[in-house]
Amino acid sequence: MSLRLTRERRPDLLAKASLSREEGNRLLTVESRVYVALLHYPVYDKNGQVVTSAVTNMDIHDIARSGKTYGIRGFYVVTPVKALQKLALKIIEHWQEGYGSQYNITRKEALALARIRDALDDVLIDIERECGEKPRIVATTARPGGNRTSFPELRDMLLKRTQPCLILFGTGWGLTETIISQSDYVLQAIQGPTDYNHLSVRSAAAIVLDRLLGRP
């Protein structure tokens, strides 16, 4: 109860607090309503054309592992292409039911978060059914400009509110403007000390989750 009240009344203190592992796990177990979706369509290619991108083994593995580390509730792999869905399912089932489930139990735990859906609308319906309300949609992009929500602002919202939150990541050259315009928030771009700005989507996902859900 004290953790819940602190989250509602003084999220700034909770963000700075040194929580025990038990307290942190309890807060995540009871309160976490954060989901991640990796969109393979609609996304841009390098020429700015809207395309469907390929599903990759490493993206599914690494984002699932990051999601498990930071306590998200579900990880969606979104593609309308049945052959790519079949590939994604094969990857997931290898670690859930096949040889991989015995070879690497931690990978099995992480891949248990993964779900495959045709489109973003299917993800939204899924989350609403599971949580009883529609999620706030947070888009990520490396492109500059527009109204952006800072990491501290979004972290504060996650601490204060119980409404589920869906964070979108785009493969290829990123989410389309159509998807971004449908989102409730657009997260500020990750920036380093150089002008180079070409992180892999799995690296970007790990950084975003750490900034939003990681311990100080």
Give short role names for the model-derived ranges:
Residues 1-35, 41, 214-216:
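SAM-dependent methyltransferases
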Residues 4, 65, 178:
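Surface-exposed charge patches
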Residues 31-142, 206-214:
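RNA substrate-binding interface of SAM-dependent RNA methyltransferases
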Residues 51, 90-92, 151-155, 181-184, ...:
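Short, glycine/charged-enriched secondary-structure capping and boundary segments
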Residues 73, 135, 164-165, 184:
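Conserved acidic residues
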Residues 139-179, 189:
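Long, charge-patterned amphipathic alpha-helical coiled-coil/hairpin "stalk" segments used as oligomerization
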Residues 173-216:
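Structured adenosyl-cofactor binding patch, chiefly the S-adenosyl-L-methionine
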